Amino acid sequence: MKAKPMMLAAAVLTIGVAACGTPPTAQSLVSQGLKAQLAGDESTAESTYQQAIKLDPNNAVAHYNLGTVYDRQGKTSQAVTEYTATLVISPSFTDALFNLAVDTATSDPAGAQRLYLRVLALQPTFAAAWLNLGFIVRDEGKLAEARTDWAKAVALDASLASHVPTIPAPTAVTKPVTPPPTSQP
């Protein structure tokens, strides 16, 4: 008696696989996850990317996309974990470097600065990296360097101009003018 239910489950599984064709690959799951994510179905995207990672733990795109889902859900620590996994697999994945820098800028500005510099070494035209690097160096008190970084960002993408803060240019320090000595009170 106990063998029949097991055979039925095996038969249902076999029929299910045969009806669907071949089992999904990590790549096909990543594609499905992306479709769900672009449609706004983050829950489906999350579980689909997780399935892809179970099938292929070295799928950098699955880790990266899962990180973006976690970011949108406000799960920053989980996003950081996924971006870090992406970079272990693919150290030159510029979008993962950038997103990791964004997510760690508050807690580790020096580390985020290094990440932005890596992004820019790989992709010097990444305007948002120049913009964000400018904010970090500004917070270090390096206003001239921040202005230079922001100028590069805006030159690459004029739409970023609205994100650049207005910081007065340094003025020349002059000695106060004092009247010449006089004999009159």
Which functions belong to the PLM regions below?
Residues 31, 65, 99, 132, ...:
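Canonical tetratricopeptide repeat
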Residues 62, 96, 129, 162-163:
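TPR alpha-solenoid repeat register
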Residues 55, 89, 122, 155-156:
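Structural marker of alpha-solenoid helical repeat scaffolds
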Residues 20-32:
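Bacterial Sec signal peptide processing site at the extreme N-terminus
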Residues 2, 135-185:
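Terminal, low-structured helical/coil segments at or just beyond the last alpha-helical repeat
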Residues 39-51, 72-85, 104-118, 141-152:
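Structural signature of tandem alpha-helical TPR/SEL1-like repeats
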